[in-house]
Amino acid sequence: MANIKSQEKRIRTNERRRLRNQSVKSSLRTAVRGFREALDAGDKDKAAELLVATSRKLDKAASKGVIHKNQAANKKSALSVALNKL
């Protein structure tokens, strides 16, 4: 346990951020999974719709600092390449 008051606050803050990050990352994984399932099913219209939603979630996560902006860009690029191959 921390002896310093500021460190006690950092522990609380880190826990709140960890829970938020965990939730955001989970929803990202779910969105990407849904997109990939639509690709596997061969449903190009649904996949295109899900790509927009997934890209939005990736951008939001990057702006919140949950993931790095380059990671978001790389994932968006890979997903759009996968859609274009369909």
Curated annotation (Swiss-Prot):
Provide ranges: composition bias, Basic and acidic residues.
1-16
Entries under Pfam families matching the protein: Ribosomal_S20p
What's one GO BP annotation on this UniProt entry? translation
Gene3D superfamilies per record: Ribosomal protein S20
Q: Which residues cross the membrane?
A: none
Which InterPro entries did the record assign? Answer: Ribosomal_bS20, Ribosomal_bS20_sf
Q: Looking at the record, which segments are called Disordered?
A: 1-25
Q: Which UniProt keywords are present, listed alphabetically?
A: Ribonucleoprotein, Ribosomal protein, RNA-binding, rRNA-binding
Gene Ontology molecular function: small ribosomal subunit rRNA binding; structural constituent of ribosome
| One GO CC annotation | small ribosomal subunit
Identify the domain of life: Bacteria
**According to its UniProt record, which protein family does this protein belong to?**
Belongs to the bacterial ribosomal protein bS20 family.
Function text: Binds directly to 16S ribosomal RNA.
Q: What is this protein called?
A: Small ribosomal subunit protein bS20
Give the species: Mycobacterium sp. (strain KMS)
